[in-house]
């Protein structure tokens, strides 16, 4: 299939249905049949984190303002200019229903968001025995950077399963799910230790796939190619 949509279109979180309809029709015209469908990711995430024991305040402080959501969804940035309002979340759910209906009418296979391991700070504080990794990105202060679960944490599969289940409960069955754990971020290991690098990548890959399949055994994991170009010297 031909995948469409760029994760980092800065103004796309502000698109209304009229703008989205034009975009979807344009993608169809160019033969795109696997468009990204990440609208309302935060509304689904909020439901998951509530089920994992966080309160609304702990969850809301995790999200950025709308303009920065593409980077939040890739695990690069938290909190910046946030939070998101209840009205925003509700509107995004309604918009995503319209988007998915149109995509499916045109025979497209939407790529939905899946869990990549990034967790709110409130979750970190509730689980002091878990060895979270604190990532860095773009020169932002540490308070805005992501915490990521280790691949051997039992929470990973539990949370990943909930993400898929909550998404499909709201939007219907889906096949393709996007998850990227290290977009423009260094792996938390010695760069010279190739054995450790490949081992960690394999562990995250296996855990991400298992977490998606736990929610939908027929799901297909999709990942972006950008990371492999941006960090080619390290990942080669």
Located regions from the model:
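N-terminal carbohydrate-binding accessory modules
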Residues: 1
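Aromatic-lined carbohydrate-binding surfaces of glycoside hydrolases
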Residues: 5-6, 10-236
